[in-house]
A protein has these predicted regions:
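Charged C-terminal helix
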Residues: 38-84, 88, 92-97, 106-111
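Short, well-ordered alpha-helix to beta-strand connector turns
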Residues: 100, 128-130, 175-176
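Short, well-ordered beta-strand core segments
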Residues: 132-133, 157, 178-179
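Short, glycine/polar-rich helix-capping loops at beta-to-alpha or helix-loop-helix junctions
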Residues: 162-174
Length: 197
């Protein structure tokens, strides 16, 4: 889980302590402060010196393509049948774009229509995308199908669900989807997954 509220405060406090109190060079103080902020985001508490000495985090893998500026396209799957669902799709699209990713959203890029009008375009959108981000709350049949289709053709999938049970998510968990139960973690997970591509 990623808990980012207060992470900036944690970074600043540890940076100042490392630089002004411990006499670290600014780059070293920033490195130590980044680690402290990562601990805070993951554990939802301020780290002690013992915490920082004994805790390790795996590095985020970044592909050569991503490092050279290429940005993967994310297919945004999710229901859009009422105001709350449309708002969530809008919010997810805006956040993914703010993270620097390209987004294909059936709601925005295809629109509403009959099965004959939209299904093949949706599937082509999945094929043309590098990964899929799914808003799964509500167990929308179309979203579930898109998740399965993406996994069947080898696309990474990040599933965001705050209300579904483990039983509801069993097939997604078992097929290698990354399951996230809060919005912030889901967004960062999508970014970290995209950075690998």
């Amino acid at each position: 889980n990623v808990w980012k509220v207060g992470s900036g405060d944690c970074f600043v406090a540890h940076f100042a302590h490392g630089w002004m109190h411990d006499g670290l060079a600014p780059a070293d103080a920033a490195r130590a402060a980044s680690f402290a902020a990562a601990f805070y985001c993951a554990k939802q508490r301020l780290p002690t010196r013992d915490d920082l000495a004994s805790c390790t985090f795996p590095p985020i893998a970044v592909s050569q393509n991503y490092a050279s500026g290429q940005r993967p396209q994310v297919y945004l799957a999710g229901p859009f049948f009422d105001l709350a669902q449309v708002w969530m799709v809008e919010q997810a699209r805006a956040t993914l774009k703010a993270l620097g990713l390209r987004v294909f959203s059936p709601y925005h890029d295809i629109g509403l229509g009959s099965a004959d009008d939209v299904v093949e375009k949706d599937l082509q959108g999945i094929r043309d995308s590098d990964m899929l981000f799914a808003i799964a709350d509500g167990l929308d049949a179309g979203t579930i199908y898109e998740i399965g289709y993406a996994r069947a053709i080898g696309k990474p999938v990040v599933v965001y669900s705050e209300r579904l049970t483990e039983e509801n998510l069993k097939m997604m968990q078992g097929s290698g989807c990354i399951i996230c139960t809060n919005y912030t973690t889901a967004m960062y997970s999508a970014l970290w997954e995209a950075a690998k591509l």
